[in-house]
Amino acid sequence: MAGDSRNAMNQDMEIGVTSQDHKKIPKQARDYIPIATDRTRLLPEGKKPRQRYMEKTGKCNVHHGNVQETYRYLSDLFTTLVDLKWRFNLLVFTMVYTITWLFFGFIWWLIAYVRGDLDHVGDQEWIPCVENLSGFVSAFLFSIETETTIGYGFRVITEKCPEGIILLLVQAILGSIVNAFMVGCMFVKISQPKKRAETLMFSNNAVISMRDEKLCLMFRVGDLRNSHIVEASIRAKLIKSRQTKEGEFIPLNQTDINVGFDTGDDRLFLVSPLIISHEINEKSPFWEMSRAQLEQEEFEVVVILEGMVEATGMTCQARSSYMDTEVLWGHRFTPVLTLEKGFYEVDYNTFHDTYETNTPSCCAKELAEMKRNGQLLQSLPSPPLLGGCAEAEKEAEAEHDEEEEPNGLSVSRATRGSM
């Protein structure tokens, strides 16, 4: 019983346990068993590569053209500034402050010009609005001192200038508003959790193979950081064009792919790499898709990982996608988690690696019908470690398709089922 529990635990975690009774040696010197991997996928003959809806980095290949109501961007100016690239954001930041300093500097110069202060520069008996303001340059410097509140020095406002006092109040208030808006915009842009998604990994390929006697679509996710993603959740969508019964063509139709929403398996504890599984059942869009049809279909699976950054509490989202050519039929992921002395070690060198495994080539619908009719193979032998999957599958089919009766007659499985 204890052995069965340990095997079940290892299967759920998909780890390979290595004995640590001997002295630990460097990782480069360990003798790992070589496993045949396949990280490439060739396009079938006559099949042209399709444009991706989403890049592997999560960037969507969608451009909005002929937008007439561009004023809508100005109605949400804060978000528009945050979404700008850094070079444009810094340009706007510099221009806003420079323009406000120049504007109020011109007003200070205009007050001095109207009052006649510029005509009495150096006159000890004349009381100007701003002392030692002799031109536009000095007015511009006084405007900077006023708005940045660095303190007056050589130039200072006098009590005999009510219009200057009013302008001082207006510039102080507007300067505070500009500071709050621009500094807030820069702070939000700096603290955006977009870069946190750079350490969230998705496998290069998705795979389709048997798991618990059911066909499953699987892909792997991982987190490189020691600080975890809180309340992590995963969802997936199938992007595929289709035509309705009425003849309407829907390009890039989106269909939800169940990755454990009804069972809670979509809520992840992403401490170590996890394999996300989608069971291909009656509600799955892959229900009638066989291996041969997979090579002819054109679709894209978009996966979205969401959660809160542990350090800041902000929501982070990482995205990736798998084209139809990146879905490997009859493959499984190579285990990456090993049990060391006192801890578990994740080897990210094999994070994207897969190996071939015996998998029926028919669709899940036909597989379910065969199971109902009692035509399923009781067990499929595991393929040799370094290949030979095709030969092992042929031998298994030959062994179960025909059975020698005592009188020497060969009876097929369908005939035995009718008996």
Swiss-Prot record:
Region Disordered, as annotated, extends over: 380-419
The record's family statement is: Belongs to the inward rectifier-type potassium channel (TC 1.A.2.1) family. KCNJ5 subfamily.
Gene behind this protein: Kcnj5
Topological region Cytoplasmic? 1-86, 186-419
Q: What is this protein called?
A: G protein-activated inward rectifier potassium channel 4
Cited Pfam families:
IRK (PF01007), IRK_C (PF17655)
Q: Which GO terms describe its cellular component?
A: external side of plasma membrane; I(KACh) inward rectifier potassium channel complex; plasma membrane; T-tubule; voltage-gated potassium channel complex
Q: What biological-process terms (Gene Ontology) are attached?
A: membrane repolarization during atrial cardiac muscle cell action potential; potassium ion import across plasma membrane; potassium ion transmembrane transport; regulation of heart rate by cardiac conduction; regulation of monoatomic ion transmembrane transport
Tissue distribution is: Most abundant in heart tissue where it is found predominantly in atria. Also found in brain, kidney, liver, spleen, lung and thymus.
Task: Quote the subcellular location field of this record.
Answer: Membrane
Give UniProt keywords alphabetically.
Ion channel, Ion transport, Membrane, Phosphoprotein, Potassium, Potassium transport, Transmembrane, Transmembrane helix, Transport, Voltage-gated channel
Specify the superkingdom: Eukaryota
Q: Any idea which residues bear Phosphoserine here? A: S5
Its UniProt entry gives the catalysed reaction(s) as: K(+)(in) = K(+)(out)
Q: What does this protein do?
A: Inward rectifier potassium channels are characterized by a greater tendency to allow potassium to flow into the cell rather than out of it. Their voltage dependence is regulated by the concentration of extracellular potassium; as external potassium is raised, the voltage range of the channel opening shifts to more positive voltages. The inward rectification is mainly due to the blockage of outward current by internal magnesium. Can be blocked by external barium. This potassium channel is controlled by G proteins.
Gene Ontology MF terms: G-protein activated inward rectifier potassium channel activity; inward rectifier potassium channel activity; voltage-gated potassium channel activity involved in atrial cardiac muscle cell action potential repolarization
**Location of the motif Selectivity filter:** 149-154
Q: How does it sit in the membrane?
A: Multi-pass membrane protein
For bias kind Low complexity, which ranges apply? 380-390
Outline the subunit composition.
Associates with KCNJ3/GIRK1 or KCNJ6/GRIK2 to form a G-protein-activated heteromultimer pore-forming unit. The resulting inward current is much larger.
Activity regulation info: Heteromultimer composed of KCNJ3/GIRK1 and KCNJ5/GIRK4 is activated by phosphatidylinositol 4,5 biphosphate (PtdIns(4,5)P2).
Parts of the chain in the membrane but not crossing it: 136-147, 148-154
> Which species?
Rattus norvegicus (Rat)
- List all membrane-crossing ranges: 87-111, 164-185
Which InterPro entries does UniProt cross-reference here?
Ig_E-set, IRK_C, K_chnl_inward-rec_Kir, K_chnl_inward-rec_Kir3.4, K_chnl_inward-rec_Kir_cyto, Kir_TM
